[in-house]
């Protein structure tokens, strides 16, 4: 039996107590995992189609739930805590990682809002926590800023959720973060913030030769 923690050895022991203490064998773990997945996949009932179609649907649904990854743990008091990859400190609350928004902002995250509204609300708050801790919204977290993925796709998640009634984050804080990232480029990472932003606002486009990927950024 192996456990881990991003926080401390003591927290790893606590994770073991919460997740594996009292578990008899691998079959029990397997059964609990199957029950957990059935609960999530059971949120959608498919009608019509062949058995192969249903298998394809639920396989895709399963894959849609693999990211973003949970990056928080529960302490002895049952409170969510996490080691932040953005400032190197331990904070109370929720944090998620391993998402590059590579078209997930178009469909997966709106789907998450429908199927997992509580988790999605926590995820949105974690985006702004990352901004508070690092000065920038994540563009590709792995587990902190990886520097990849052009565009500011976190903007669309925050706007979409607010329009649909999610209130887990401060809209003024979100607006501040979006304005900041739309009018500046981080001194680290290729795609954190918005490179070429000045040319775009002055000329209406990002010209070739001044920054990478000008067509996509325009």
Predicted regions and their residues:
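Acidic/polar, glycine-enriched structural segments that form the non-catalytic walls/loops
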Residues: 1-95, 136-137, 167-186
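Flexible loop/turn segments at secondary-structure boundaries
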Residues: 7-10, 67, 71, 81, ...
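Short secondary-structure transition/capping motifs
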Residues: 26, 49, 96-100, 112, ...
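Extracytoplasmic/secreted envelope proteins and their assembly/folding machinery
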Residues: 34, 38, 61, 108, ...
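A conserved hydrophobic secondary-structure block that centers on an alpha-helix together
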Residues: 47-50, 94-98, 108-110, 117-122, ...
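Secondary-structure capping and boundary motifs in well-ordered enzyme cores
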Residues: 52-53, 94-103, 146-154, 217
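Alpha-helical support elements that line or immediately flank enzyme active sites
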Residues: 57-73, 97-120, 159-164, 218
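Active-site cavity-forming subdomains of large catalytic enzyme subunits
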Residues: 134-218
């Amino acid at each position: 039996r192996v456990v881990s923690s991003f926080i401390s050895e003591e927290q790893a022991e606590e994770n073991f107590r919460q997740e594996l203490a009292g578990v008899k064998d691998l079959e029990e773990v397997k059964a609990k995992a199957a029950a957990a997945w059935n609960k999530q996949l059971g949120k959608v009932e498919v009608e019509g189609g062949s058995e192969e179609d249903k298998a394809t649907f639920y396989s895709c649904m399963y894959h849609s739930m693999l990211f973003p990854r949970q990056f928080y743990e529960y302490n002895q008091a049952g409170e969510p805590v996490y080691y932040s990859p953005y400032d190197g400190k331990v904070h109370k609350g929720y944090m998620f990682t391993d998402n590059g928004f590579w078209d997930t902002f178009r469909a997966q995250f709106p789907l998450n809002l429908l199927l997992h509204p509580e988790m999605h609300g926590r995820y949105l708050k974690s985006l702004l926590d990352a901004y508070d801790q690092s000065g920038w919204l994540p563009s590709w977290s792995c587990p902190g800023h990886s520097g990849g993925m052009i565009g500011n796709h976190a903007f669309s998640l925050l706007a979409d959720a607010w329009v649909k009634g999610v209130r887990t984050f401060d809209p003024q804080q979100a607006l501040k973060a979006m304005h900041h990232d739309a009018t500046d480029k981080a001194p680290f990472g290729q795609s954190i913030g918005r490179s070429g932003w000045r040319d775009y606002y002055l000329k209406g486009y990002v010209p070739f030769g001044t920054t990478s990927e000008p067509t996509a950024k325009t």
